[in-house]
Regions:
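Basic, Lys/Arg- and aromatic-enriched nucleic-acid-binding interface segment
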Residues: 1-41, 49, 60, 76-78, ...
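C-terminal secondary-structure termini that scaffold catalytic or DNA-interacting sites
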Residues: 12-15, 50, 61-87, 93, ...
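N-terminal core-binding DNA-recognition domain of tyrosine site-specific recombinases/integrases
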Residues: 17-19, 126-133, 147-153
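C-terminal catalytic core of tyrosine-transesterase DNA break-rejoin enzymes
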Residues: 26, 30-37, 131-132, 136-143, ...
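Short, polar N-cap/turn motifs at the start of nucleic acid-interacting alpha helices
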Residues: 45-52, 148, 167-187
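Catalytic-site neighborhood detector that most strongly recognizes the C-terminal catalytic loop/helix
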Residues: 59-61, 88, 176-202
């Protein structure tokens, strides 16, 4: 995963990339979504007034079925996330870009999009293959000066940064859609211990100062 400085650098590098991939990667970093959850998003899932994202489904691929939508990984994966102001603004710009693309492409735009208005599609409005974003991100990382991380590492980065910022484990677990809090604790035990150590040091610093003043 990336640390705070590397994550900020990633966002800076994305400024020069196509808006569709800039939006996808930024959203993954800001929300901790799974790849399939990202690809399954529809515009009705976003409440721009309240800055909320409703995670309702996941997009998958099987050779015998092609790209299809399924329920989320588990019942707790069905969740509502609060979007950051930066993510909301980027989504608004991306929606304007997609609307202009629909007008430009015209009749070639997939009819099915009207019933299921996906955020992220092929050039003609069809469901995006989940591996498309994986392949793009792999190439992007190779030509960057960032560590060799995978697309799933963005989910770990999101969780690690939340923990480092002092977010409690139960909230992080709910945010990630984990079935059990113990899953979060097992995966991020090192980050949790580091955050606890930092909290202990901060408390020690405060109490030591109070003691000296007394």
């Amino acid at each position: 995963y990336l640390d705070e400085v590397q994550a900020a650098h990633l966002l800076d590098l994305l400024d020069d990339e196509p808006i569709v991939y800039r939006t996808m990667i930024t959203l993954l970093l800001h929300t901790g979504l799974r790849r399939g959850e990202l690809c399954g998003l529809e515009w009705d899932d976003i409440n721009f007034d309240l800055s909320l994202l409703d995670v309702q489904r996941t997009s998958l691929y099987l050779p015998e079925k092609g790209v299809f939508v399924d329920e989320t990984k588990n019942s707790t994966s069905r969740r509502v996330l609060k979007l950051t102001p930066d993510a909301v603004q980027l989504l608004k710009r991306y929606r304007m870009w997609q609307n202009s693309e629909r007008l430009r492409i015209g009749d070639q735009w997939a009819e099915e999009w009207e019933q299921h208005p996906r955020l992220f599609t092929t050039w003609d409005g069809k469901p995006l293959h989940p591996s498309t974003v994986t392949g793009w991100f792999h190439t992007f990382i190779e030509r960057s000066d960032l560590p060799p991380i995978s697309i799933h590492s963005l989910r770990h980065t999101n969780a690690t940064l939340l923990i480092a910022a002092g977010t409690n484990v139960r909230t992080v677990s709910s945010h990630l859609g984990h079935a059990q809090t113990s899953t979060t604790m097992n995966i991020y035990s090192h980050s949790i211990k580091s955050a606890e150590a930092a909290a202990a040091e901060a408390l020690q610093s405060v109490l030591t100062r109070k003691k000296k003043q007394a």
